[in-house]
Amino acid sequence: MKKIILTLLAGCALYSCKPSETAAALKSKVETIDVTIKLIDVKDDKVMVTVTAPKFNTEEVTYSMPKIVPGTYSIDDYGKYIDDFKAFDNKGTVLPTSKLDVNTWIIKDAKNVAKVTYLVNDTFDTEKGSGFGTADIFSPAGTNIDADKNFMLNMHGFVGYFKDKKELPYNVTISHPETLWGATSMTDLDASTTNDFFKTSRYAELVENPVMYSKPDYTTFVVDGMEILIGVYSPTGKVTAESITPEMKTMMTAQKTFLGKINATKKYTVLLYLSTMSETDAKGFGALEHPTATTVVMPEMLLKDELLKSMIDVVSHEFFHIVTPLSVHSKEIHDFDYNAPKMSKHLWMYEGVTEYFANLFQINQGLITEEDFYKRMAEKIEHANAMNDTMPFTTMSANVLTEPYKEQYLNVYEKGALIGMCLDIIIREKSNGERGILDLMQKLSNEYGVSKPFNDNELFAKITTFTYPEVGAFLEKHVAGETPIPYDLYFSKVGITKTSKKEPVNVFLKGQMPYISVDQQTKEIIVIPNIELNDFYRNLDLKGGDILKAINDKPYSLENIYEMITISQTWKEGDAITVKIKRNGSEQLLKGTVKLPYEDKEGLSFTDTSKKAQKEAWLKG
């Protein structure tokens, strides 16, 4: 999690080729779980799901929706979105059921159960935008039901499992309006234009394959043998799949080149949902990884350059999850328990090393400059220092679902990435620049792979065997231990030192302190009174209490304040600007130029030229 593209050809495209075989003919004689999801005749914003039951030899059985799903690291309780749960025998008689907890139903007379049915509510329209770790489900892990327009099917929000039957094959039939098309990495085995049929080997495979139904807007391309599909839902049509494909192709080509032979994935799908940010739309932005897909949710109002930058950062992160945890993971992940999860100790690797790769590949492949990369690492140090720097990372990881560890989760993208960076530098130093952390991950992938998980307690020893004693000592001291990382020591090995320079900051925010607020009744944006304003306000003679009506002739209010803040991040020193305000009941038009506020920021620079070879091996090796 990080926690976020051509015209439909008649009958056949890369991901929509449909053989003439019928769904019925394809169903195996082996016992299966057959699921039907109806995206037609949607009533009260709910979707009907029917699940056929296998044979049971017990008097009762349970059916559960997930409490948690892989990659989210939060309790989400998808059962709370289920209504009108019923069980039937093969004559259509309703069987007695009861609720065990929010996610689980007990079905009596299990020997006679033929199917269960229920209605699914979506998650997008109940989000409050309260952020990670709250009651909100992270949007990329959520669901959307917008009849005849869009259905975001993260399968864990629609399909559950019978106790002890998760390993049976799942066959899923989805009926949908003819005007909508489902973007997914799965292969549709039904030739109908209103029914899709998908076969998966087990429940875990099903929930790792999201489908997004909308008016067809997608592109496909091939990069080094990998088939890639980019599917987009943009409510207003502002963004199209074709408009973002060149940058996505450049990025994914660079990623494939960076990974080399470590990557064997044959298909990959990026599902981009753009939110209107209305009261009933998604508000959690980012992405969620799957082995062969990524679901991405972003605000539709983003400027194209901002959208592309965000897409590159979050999609590249999710794509690198094909290394870990897809190819390298523990038993806790391989045999994931959706309702009584045991968490792995190695989030530093699953999320941290992945985040490091998502930044390293960009400098390695020439997508960003060295200065950009150093700035990103400096920001991660700043953010990590604001967290609990003595909490053992392995302890936090194993207990991430509960406090006080839960509140430290976001550090996996900060200190976790820095752990990966330090390991990379150590390995480069000890191997005279010949190898780095990517080589380590390739060895681990060869040792384990998709179907062979490792034991949590054995990973450090295995890594040490594949690398050097210094790597093992670092892991024990700074990852399993309480000792903060001396970043200066590791930067010095590649000629990098700390520097301080003035950097422009946002005109509307100083850290977490805003300079503006909103009148909840009038929805007007107000400059906060009785605080010291920065140079931007002083230069334009803006005062506390002024109501911001428009900037550069574009009106702003609560409805589009996010867009205003986003656009402000593109302003340059000296840009011409006009601000329409209301002061003491009278409207005024202020004209002037942008004067950005600056703050002293601790940065990083390459200063020791004697270490140029080591630095080049680290960043370009």
Task: For the regions a language model picked out, list residue spans one by one.
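Sec-dependent N-terminal signal peptides
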Residues: 4-12
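C-terminal motif of bacterial Sec signal peptides marking the signal peptidase cleavage site
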Residues: 15-16
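Early extracytoplasmic/domain-onset interaction patches
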Residues: 24-68, 154
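Non-catalytic architectural context of zinc metalloproteases
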Residues: 75-84, 88, 92-265, 283-286
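Juxtacatalytic substrate-recognition/specificity segment
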Residues: 219-346
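C-terminal recognition in membrane/secretory proteostasis and scaffolding
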Residues: 358-359, 367-621
